Structure formats: structure tokens, C-alpha cells
């Protein structure tokens, strides 16, 4: 059959049952993305005869004679469609993976449609932005501008990739047809014909493989290899990645004979197509010895419980207590908490629980691997940590790290989920076995059922205070379900009780925390890295304490938060820390800003699906109860134990600069800020700075993009390299001028020297780039280890309405004040805060990965796992404290993870204010809030 695709004819023969999305991508149309393959997210939206459709559920065989238009067909980076230009200038994206679909849908909207945008765009999801920037794009609002030479800091510069993203031409992980082309900026030739990998998952939560028969699978035409535990390289590792691999337990194998959660790999098939590989998986015959399983962390620690890793040891594998299923624990404090509580004028004691949350990044985990002509293993993969992936792959497979290259193109969302090694190891095993190019791509179901989630926690908080509100005792007792494996199970536990506890002054503190193995799917790194769960509990308890004492919640916090000079104590007041008060302090400003915002008029009530807010005024709307809440959070500007970045800046012919940096870009915005920092130091504009990034060939080392370290670590290193290059430029220019300029009698030559876009001006003379480079290359290197660290602060405020008949909670006002130091790019930072708040609202009100009693995930699609839509999220008002942090680049702090943490308790405190009942469990779904109201009505209380 024949189609017209983006103005060109395409003669194709679809496979039986094939959908339009896969057909287009097979023919090199990579602007069409895979987000769900179920018609839920809109990333694959195209126009068929000018009507927007989800190509992932559109049967290809029905389209003979049709005209198909993708984002690439609407316009190009050089000549964008008006809607594409609007999305670039708003900017209506962060990671950008959803943007092509949004642009295609938006291109069809009339003025009347724009007035009904929440309904018209309900089929398009964005995980990053919080939707305000997308609405700005729809309204033609321009939030970006160009920077003057040397003056990019503080300017809302557009992302370097903006025009490519909106036109669908920016490359993501699998946006290559059969391989990488010769002459591409990767320097790689076209690879061999592509093989695909599919996995057979365990049907049991705990089992041992007695035997496995792969004969029938191997006999299927098109199958090249069937991999089982017999092919495992025999090296234990952790999928969680950190600068020091010793931060995580060695408890995982590429393919294990013992299976510890439903869906764990039993076998992997490498075949000519995904379809053949999946068919072969069904032909693998396995005899399982089913073992007892345990799914509750309390039961897992009881004597006689099934042991998940009882064959491992603390000394060798870094597991705290294998005989108790405990990965790690922390027990300690300052003083006697029981005595302090008994002597307090007021006390609070409560237990808060949080559920599993999916990262729900629209680009799923994916890796393509091959061996290049030089014999190096190359992995093109969706990761936040390319260098850490390289090093662990080399260790597990006994390879020289110099013989492994890891490349991450733009990544379609991370949020911590791509700080894992989930696909790269199997692809490596398959490439080494077959010698061919192999691709492994998670389905959306895999993302829900196999990929790690946020750690569910149970947190008991006990607080004591004097009558004037001064804290006298703080006890946190935290239990964390890390699932079947300990990836991040140590780090998240320790981090969750660090800044959340240290932010308050209190003479007596105690922390009891344990991270526990269960036969549930693994948990992992997630935005906030455990702080969000514990902050929810502590800030809720602080709100209850304020009510107990009759003190305003903001005032209670003012009386108890740390101020410069205070020790930052968790359990040991004498512990040495690299956290420094030399950094800025803006928590006091943030409290004031949110307090003032909540005292002001209510913003326009957002239009949302569901019952109308009716009545003559909101305060009298029938069936609705209204409340106000706030919460605060602190977070260190980067992770502890070191975070390293090595960078370079080089002058190119024509006055352009090229930076080499290992940091991945996945919507975190570091690429934009990196160009701003370098342009400012070198007296040029960001558009003249080229970026070679997230490639293990781009720099000597980079720990990766996690812990909000992209600006404060790699950014600081890049700025130092740019300053060093500036000094080299001026020195060379002075030498050139001095060689042809007679010296004065005194021998002093002291004209003004300025680095400009066209060269270096020495007095009145301009030394151009060509002359500078004629003397040899000009390149500078610098590194930074991320120490010392300072603290960033966020305060969130919320006003909510609770619908008593149904339990629905609507956020009417969302405001967050942030202490981010110097704001390098205001629009980009605003977007990070809005996106973090929107993600947190989702996990506060409805997002939860649910498991049945046997560990089976029951929310395995976007239709059962609700991600906020454009109609769900209020606009978050973002306020900046006026601070300057001398520890960060040009005074900046990190601010990617911080906005997430205070949102849940702020909303929960507002719900408590509205209905008079304390919610203790996240998410606060309609059913749960309704049950609270029903119990109170029936006399059951909260």
C-alpha cells in the first residue's frame, strides 16, 4: 500500500496487526515516539488526513492512500511551524519527549478549541513541566530571550535543542534506523542489522529454577540466542549506581537461578524481531521450585521469615543483616527521647505511610549495543550516569573500561529512575554472545512491573515541645520496603532521615531506621531520594504540634528551624560533615514569601474534571470544605561521599566554543545552564557554545546527573575551565600584540584586555580567533568534586477544597518559595519547580503502584496508574529568595529535586485544616479521604 508521509510517498507492506507507530519508525520516521503503546500518553500523535490520532493504536493496514503528517512534517528547526515556534519560545517542554505529540495535536486547535484546551489535550501527557509552560505556548507567551555577549547569567535563554525538540528532530536513545551513520557527531559507522531482545519473567514472587529447557525456543527461525542463568558472568553487582560502587550491596546477577520477585528475568531471547523473541520466550520450559515469599517488611524481619539473601554476608556483599532481611539500619540519637517527651508541655505521636510511585518518564528504559570497528563495546542507552554504567559493565563482564563506550543522547525523563543499570547488562551479554547489534527496550508495562519505584515507607514521628513552641524531642522511626534487591536501599534510607531531621533545632533527637528486603518489586532512586516520604511525616507532625500549642504553623517553624551557625544534627552532634554555612541561607525569606502569598486573594480556580465548585463564593460552595497548609524542606546541594566532574572548553575556528562534559540531559536543563556559564566567562553568547556531553568519550569522568549535581558540580567545573581558557586567550593575545608593538621606554605594556565574540581586544586592537589558533590549539580543563556542600531550602503552601460527598481533593492554590541562590535561568528554574510540584501533587493525591498479596503489580498501564493531566494541575506560583551562595557557580544552588519534597505535607496539612481530620496515608485518594469523613461521621474519628 502507499502512504504519503510528511510530503513524501511511502510504499509499504504492513505486518499482520502492525500499528502506524512501528511502521513509521521502521522506515526512519523517528519524530514519532513510543510512550505507552496503549493510546494513553499522546507521545506518538500524528495527523492522518489532518486529524490527530495516536499512532500506537492506529492499525496500519487501514491507511492505504492516507496522508500522514508528523512533527517533522509540520516544520523544521530552520523553518518551524508557528506552533513549533511558540513551543520553543515558551518553552513548552523540559525533557521534550512528549513535545512532538503535543505540537501535532496543538497544530489542529482552533480558537474555540483553545478555550476548551483541557478536554482537547487530555490525551497528551507531560511528566516534566507541570503544563503551565505548555499553556503559555498555546497562548503565544514568550518567556525566553537572547543574551548579550558575556551577560547570559540571569537570562531566560532558550535550550540549545529547542528548535530540534519541537520539530521532532532531536535524537533520543533509539532514534536511529539500523545504526549510527558514518560522519555523525558520534564518529560511529553504521552498525550491522539489528537484533532484538525480549525477556521471560518469573511468574512467582520467590522460586528456584530446577531446570530450564530452551531447545524449542532456540529452534524457532529467527532466534539467535537464548540466555539463562547458565550464561550469567558470575559477578554480583547492584543495579543502583553511585560514584562509589561500595555504596550499594552486591546482591544482583544478570541472570539468577533464584528468583525473588514477580517479573524477574528467567531467560532472555535474542532474535530478528521483538515478535519472534516474544514467541520464543513462550517456548522456554521452566521447572520451578516455588519458595515461600514475604511481602511485608515487618513480617520479613521476624524469626523464621523466608530469607531473600541469606546466602550472602555483611562483609563481602555489604548487606546489614542478611539473617533478618535487613539491608541497612541506623539507630542513634542525642539524649533520652523518652524522658524528654515525658517532660514536654505538648506532644504529638503519629504514623504516616507512603505508597510506591512510578517515575513514569515517557521514554522507557532502552539500550542498543554493538562492537565498533576498533573492537570496543558501545552502548547507546537511556541513562543518567553513562560513566558509572561503563565502569560497572566493565567490572561485571571483565572488560577493560577503555574498551567500553557509553553514549546517552537526550533522555526522555529520568527522576532517578535512570540511575539504574536495567537494560545495559543484558544487552552487553547478548552482544558478546552474538557479535551482533542488539536492542532491548522496556515496554510501558515493564516500567510499572519491573523497573524500581519510589520506596514505600512507614514513618512514626514523635515530637515534644515547651509551651512556647520550642522543640524538646524529635523521634523518627522509619521502616522502608526496598523490595527484592538493595539498589539504593542503603543510600535512600540514610538520606531520608538526614536533612529532614537536621533542619530543626532540638536538644534531643533519635532516629531508628531500617531498609528491609521483601519479595516485592525493587525500589530505587526517586526524586528527593527518600526525603519526600520522611518530610511528609515530620511536617505533618509539626502541623499537629502547632495546633496542639495554638501557635501559627509558620511561626512554629520560625522558632525551630536551623539558622547559620547552628549544628546540623541528625544523631551525632560531633559528626564531621562537609555541609557548610558559608553557603547562603534563605529559609527565612521563603517562609515569609509563602506566608504572604497564602494571605493574599485566591487565584482563579483551575478548571478540572469532576464536581463543580458551586455557590455564590468559594467560602460558601455547597458540599466543599476549604483549608490552608504549608510545609518546608531542606536538601544538600549534592549527594554526600563525592560527586566528580571533569570538563573541557575549547576554542574552535570561527569563534565557536566546544565544551566536553559527561552530564546527561533529560529535562534537568543543565545543558542550557552550562552554555550560559561558559558564554559568560568567555564574553560570548550561548548560541556559540557547542556541547559534547553524556558520552564517556566527552570527558575523563563525570559521576552523572543525579542529586541535582549538574549545575553545582559539572557547572562549577565548566565555569572554571572557561575562566582558565579566558586567561589563556588573553595571554596569547597579549603576546601577539606585544610581539608587534614597540614597548614604551619603561617597558610597560598595560592596555585593557577584553574577550569578545570575535576575538580578544587588546586596547584598540582586535586579535581574531584565526590568529589566536594559528599559534596552536586553545583548550582548558577543570574538575570539581562537589565539596563543600551547602543547603537549599523550599517552602510550599497550598489551599485546597475537599468535596465531602466524594472525598475528592482539589488544589486551588499552589505556591512555592525556593532558596536557589543566584537564579541562572529564571524561566528554566521556574519550570523545574513547577514540574516538581506537579509530580508531587500526583503522588500526593492519586499516583500509586499497587501490588496484590503475592507481589503482583495491578497498576501496569497509564489507564490504571494516573499521571496528572493538563486538567489536573494548578499553576504553581514560584517565588525566589534573594540569596547568593559562594559555594556554587556564580552563586547558584541546585534545585531539581528540592521542589518535590514539601508538597505532600503542605497539601495534607491543608486537607487537615479543611475537614478537621488528619490524613496519615499517601496518596490521599478520593476513596481514602471519603473513608476518613465517613469514619468521623460514624463516630470512628480519624
Predicted regions and their residues:
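Signature of N-terminal electron-transfer/Fe-S-associated modules in redox systems
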Residues: 1-152, 167
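Short beta-strand elements
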Residues: 46, 170, 174, 366-371, ...
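Glycine-rich loop/linker segments at domain edges
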Residues: 91, 161, 241-249, 318-367, ...
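Flexible, low-hydrophobicity surface segments
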Residues: 139-318
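Extended active-site and interfacial segments that coordinate phosphate-rich ligands
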Residues: 197, 282-289, 295, 384-387, ...
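C-terminal catalytic domains of large/alpha subunits in multi-subunit enzymes
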Residues: 230, 398-403, 433-438, 467, ...
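Helix-loop-helix junctions that connect adjacent transmembrane helices in secondary transporters/permeases
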Residues: 308-397, 563-656, 858-872, 877-879
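Thiamine diphosphate
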Residues: 410, 414-435, 439-441, 670-677
Amino acid at each position: 500500500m502507499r502512504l504519503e508521509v510528511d510530503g513524501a510517498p511511502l510504499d509499504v507492506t504492513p505486518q499482520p496487526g502492525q500499528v502506524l507507530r512501528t511502521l513509521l519508525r521502521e522506515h526512519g520516521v523517528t519524530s514519532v515516539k513510543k510512550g505507552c503503546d496503549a493510546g494513553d500518553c499522546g507521545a506518538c500523535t500524528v495527523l492522518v488526513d489532518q486529524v490527530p490520532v495516536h499512532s500506537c493504536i492506529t492499525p496500519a493496514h487501514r491507511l492505504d492512500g492516507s496522508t500522514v503528517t508528523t512533527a517533522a512534517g509540520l516544520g523544521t528547526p530552520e523553518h518551524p511551524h508557528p506552533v513549533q515556534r511558540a513551543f520553543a519560545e515558551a518553552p513548552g517542554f523540559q525533557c521534550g519527549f512528549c513535545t512532538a505529540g503535543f505540537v501535532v495535536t496543538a497544530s489542529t486547535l482552533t480558537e474555540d478549541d483553545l478555550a476548551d484546551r483541557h478536554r482537547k489535550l487530555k490525551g497528551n501527557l507531560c511528566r516534566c513541566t507541570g503544563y503551565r509552560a505548555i499553556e503559555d505556548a498555546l497562548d503565544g507567551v514568550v518567556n525566553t530571550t537572547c543574551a548579550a555577549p558575556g551577560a547570559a547569567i540571569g537570562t531566560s535563554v532558550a535550550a540549545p535543542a529547542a528548535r530540534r525538540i519541537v520539530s521532532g528532530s532531536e535524537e533520543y536513545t533509539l532514534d536511529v534506523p539500523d545504526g549510527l551513520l558514518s560522519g555523525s557527531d558520534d564518529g560511529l559507522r553504521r552498525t550491522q542489522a539489528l537484533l532484538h531482545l525480549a525477556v521471560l519473567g518469573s511468574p512467582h514472587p520467590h522460586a528456584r529454577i530446577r531446570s530450564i529447557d530452551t531447545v524449542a525456543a532456540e529452534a524457532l527461525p529467527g532466534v539467535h540466542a537464548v540466555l539463562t542463568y547458565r550464561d550469567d558472568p558470575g559477578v554480583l553487582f547492584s543495579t543502583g549506581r553511585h560514584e562509589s560502587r561500595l555504596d550499594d550491596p552486591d546482591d544482583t546477577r544478570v541472570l539468577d537461578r533464584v528468583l525473588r520477585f514477580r517479573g524477574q528475568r528467567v531467560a532472555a531471547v535474542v532474535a530478528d524481531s521483538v515478535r519472534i523473541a516474544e514467541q520464543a520466550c513462550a517456548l522456554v520450559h521452566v521447572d520451578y521450585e516455588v519458595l515461600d515469599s514475604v511481602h511485608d517488611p515487618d513480617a520479613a524481619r521476624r524469626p523464621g521469615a523466608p530469607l531473600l539473601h541469606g546466602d550472602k554476608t555483611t562483609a563481602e556483599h555489604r548487606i546489614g543483616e542478611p539473617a533478618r532481611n535487613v539491608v541497612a539500619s541506623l539507630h542513634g540519637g542525642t539524649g533520652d527521647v523518652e524522658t524528654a517527651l515525658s517532660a514536654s508541655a505538648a506532644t504529638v505521636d503519629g504514623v504516616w505511610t507512603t505508597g510506591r510511585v512510578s517515575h513514569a518518564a515517557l521514554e522507557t528504559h532502552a539500550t542498543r549495543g554493538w562492537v565498533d570497528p576498533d573492537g570496543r563495546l558501545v552502548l547507546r542507552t537511556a541513562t543518567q550516569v553513562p560513566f558509572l554504567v561503563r565502569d560497572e559493565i566493565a567490572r561485571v563482564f571483565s572488560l577493560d573500561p577503555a574498551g567500553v563506550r557509553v553514549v546517552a543522547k537526550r533522555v526522555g525523563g529520568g527522576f532517578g529512575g535512570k540511575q539504574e543499570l536495567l537494560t545495559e547488562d543484558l544487552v552487553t551479554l547478548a552482544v558478546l554472545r552474538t557479535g551482533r547489534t542488539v536492542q532491548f527496550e522496556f515496554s510501558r508495562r515493564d516500567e510499572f512491573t519491573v523497573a524500581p519505584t519510589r520506596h514505600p515507607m512507614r514513618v512514626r514521628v514523635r515530637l515534644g515541645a515547651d509551651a512556647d513552641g520550642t522543640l524538646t524531642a524529635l523521634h523518627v522511626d522509619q521502616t522502608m520496603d526496598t523490595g527484592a534487591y538493595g539498589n539504593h536501599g542503603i543510600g535512600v534510607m540514610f538520606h531520608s532521615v538526614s536533612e529532614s531531621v537536621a533542619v530543626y533545632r532540638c536538644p534531643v533527637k533519635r532516629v531508628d531506621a531500617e531498609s528491609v528486603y521483601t519479595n516485592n518489586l525493587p525500589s530505587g532512586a526517586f526524586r528527593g531520594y527518600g526525603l519526600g516520604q520522611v518530610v511528609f511525616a515530620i511536617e505533618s507532625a509539626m502541623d499537629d504540634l502547632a495546633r496542639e500549642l495554638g501557635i501559627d504553623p509558620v511561626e512554629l517553624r520560625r522558632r525551630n528551624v536551623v539558622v547559620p551557625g547552628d549544628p546540623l544534627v541528625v544523631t551525632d552532634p560531633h559528626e564531621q560533615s562537609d555541609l557548610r554555612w558559608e553557603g547562603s541561607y534563605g529559609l527565612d525569606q521563603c517562609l515569609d514569601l509563602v506566608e504572604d502569598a497564602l494571605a493574599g486573594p485566591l487565584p482563579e480556580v483551575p478548571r478540572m474534571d469532576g464536581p463543580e465548585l458551586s455557590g455564590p463564593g468559594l467560602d460558601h460552595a455547597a458540599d466543599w470544605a476549604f483549608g490552608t497548609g504549608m510545609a518546608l524542606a531542606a536538601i544538600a546541594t549534592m549527594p554526600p561521599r563525592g560527586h566528580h566532574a571533569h570538563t573541557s572548553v575549547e576554542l574552535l575556528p570561527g569563534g565557536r566554543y566546544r565544551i566536553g562534559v559527561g552530564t546527561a540531559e533529560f529535562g534537568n536543563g543543565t545543558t542550557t545552564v552550562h552554555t550560559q556559564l561558559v558564554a559568560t566567562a568567555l564574553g560570548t553568547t550561548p548560541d556559540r557554545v557547542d556541547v559534547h556531553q553524556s558520552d564517556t568519550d566527552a570527558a575523563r569522568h563525570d559521576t552523572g546527573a543525579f542529586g541535582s549535581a549538574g549545575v553545582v558540580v559539572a557547572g562549577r567545573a565548566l565555569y572554571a575551565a572557561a575562566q582558565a581558557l579566558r586567561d589563556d586567550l588573553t595571554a596569547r593575545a597579549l603576546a601577539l600584540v606585544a610581539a608587534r608593538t614597540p614597548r614604551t621606554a619603561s617597558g610597560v605594556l598595560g592596555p585593557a584586555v577584553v574577550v569578545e565574540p570575535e576575538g580578544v581586544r587588546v586596547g584598540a586592537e582586535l586579535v581574531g580567533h584565526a590568529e589566536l589558533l594559528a599559534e596552536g590549539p586553545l583548550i582548558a580543563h577543570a574538575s570539581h568534586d562537589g565539596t563543600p556542600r551547602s543547603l537549599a531550602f523550599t517552602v510550599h503552601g497550598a489551599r485546597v477544597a475537599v468535596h465531602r460527598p466524594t472525598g475528592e481533593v482539589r488544589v486551588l492554590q499552589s505556591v512555592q518559595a525556593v532558596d536557589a541562590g543566584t537564579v541562572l535561568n529564571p524561566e528554566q528554574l521556574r519550570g523545574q519547580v513547577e514540574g516538581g510540584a506537579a509530580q508531587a501533587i500526583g503522588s500526593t493525591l492519586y499516583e500509586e503502584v499497587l501490588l496484590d498479596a503475592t507481589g503482583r503489580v495491578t497498576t501496569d498501564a497509564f489507564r490504571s496508574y494516573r499521571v496528572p493531566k493538563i486538567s489536573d494541575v494548578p499553576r504553581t506560583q514560584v517565588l525566589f529568595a534573594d540569596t547568593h551562595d559562594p559555594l556554587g557557580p556564580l552563586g547558584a544552588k541546585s534545585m531539581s529535586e528540592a521542589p518535590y519534597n514539601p508538597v505532600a505535607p503542605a497539601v495534607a496539612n491543608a486537607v487537615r485544616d479543611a475537614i478537621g481530620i488528619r490524613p496519615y496515608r499517601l496518596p490521599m485518594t478520593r476513596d481514602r479521604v471519603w473513608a476518613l469523613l465517613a469514619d468521623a461521621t460514624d463516630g470512628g474519628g480519624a
